Structure formats: structure tokens, C-alpha cells
Swiss-Prot record:
Belongs to the HPPK family. Its EC number is 2.7.6.3. Catalyzes the transfer of pyrophosphate from adenosine triphosphate (ATP) to 6-hydroxymethyl-7,8-dihydropterin, an enzymatic step in folate biosynthesis pathway. InterPro entries: Hppk (IPR000550), Hppk_sf (IPR035907). This is 2-amino-4-hydroxy-6-hydroxymethyldihydropteridine pyrophosphokinase. One of its GO terms (molecular function) is kinase activity. The gene is folK. It is an enzyme of class 2 (transferase). The keyword Transferase applies. Pathway: Cofactor biosynthesis; tetrahydrofolate biosynthesis; 2-amino-4-hydroxy-6-hydroxymethyl-7,8-dihydropteridine diphosphate from 7,8-dihydroneopterin triphosphate: step 4/4. Keywords: ATP-binding, Folate biosynthesis, Kinase, Nucleotide-binding, Transferase. It comes from Helicobacter pylori (strain J99 / ATCC 700824) (Campylobacter pylori J99). The lineage of its organism: Bacteria, Pseudomonadati, Campylobacterota, Epsilonproteobacteria, Campylobacterales. GO terms for biological process: folic acid biosynthetic process; tetrahydrofolate biosynthetic process. CDD domains: HPPK (cd00483). It holds the Pfam family HPPK.
Amino acid sequence: MMREILTNRFFPSLFKKRLDFSNRVVLGLGSNLKNPLKILKSCFLYFKNHSKIGKIFSSPIYINPPFGYTNQPNFYNATIILKTSLGLRHFFALVFYIERRFGRARKRDFKDAPRTLDIDIIAFNQVILRQNDLTLPHPKWSERDSVLVPLTLQQILFKREEW
């Protein structure tokens, strides 16, 4: 059961644009198909270069075994905290688009199936929401090492006033 922390030029990283948007979002990223490191880097760059995203900072990458269905490659996970001018529904649509852009099929073969890219919205400001397609904060974030480890490392590496 391998667990490992990876760092590179983009993970962890703090990037600030001159614009400072008001909506604060916490994301969990995961990938275990094709080239997970390349996919996570490309996802980070997509958010970084988006005109509606201001500050963005990422955790180190946490490599960990899958849960649920375990006969699959290890997951590469990271967290990203960003500021955006997009409202919740527009941001949710952007996440949906990015997942598809990176090859994620909307229909999974089965629960906990391998995937090229999974983006979970862990939190959006202080919104509490329970709908069929979205629950905030993410209902299982506090039970998953794939979120807790990167998020904890992120908090250690960056002072709150930096973001």
C-alpha cells in the first residue's frame, strides 16, 4: 500500500493575478489513468489561465491507493484553493466541462471506477447546499485521506493571509 508525496513546479504552487475575485473555492483533484501527473498539471494550468480565476494555489500531490474498487492504479490527488468571479452554478458547469475535456466519461462503468480526472468541489464560500447534482460542502471530504492529506499540507505551506 504505497503512499507518497510529490512536489514539482506546479504542486505546491501559489499564483496571484492582479484581480482578486470574491468567491473562494476548495477543490479536490484526482487522476489514476493515462498520465496522472500530466493531467493534474494541465488541469492546474487551465484554472490558472482562466480569465475568471484570480488567486490559485495548490497542494503537493498525494499518491495513495484507491478505495472502494481496489483493482486499479493508485490515485494522484491534490487540492486547489482558488478565487473566482464565477457564481456557483457557472463554476460547477466549468468543472463539468474540464472533466470532459480531459477525457472523463460522465457515465461511470461502476462506482469508484478509474478515471482520467475527477474534480470535486469541496467548498464554495460558506455555501451549504443539498441538491441532486451537488452537495456542499462535499459530504465525504473529511473522511478521505485523498483530500485531508493534501489540504493539511497546503495549510502548512501557505499562510492564510497569502490567499
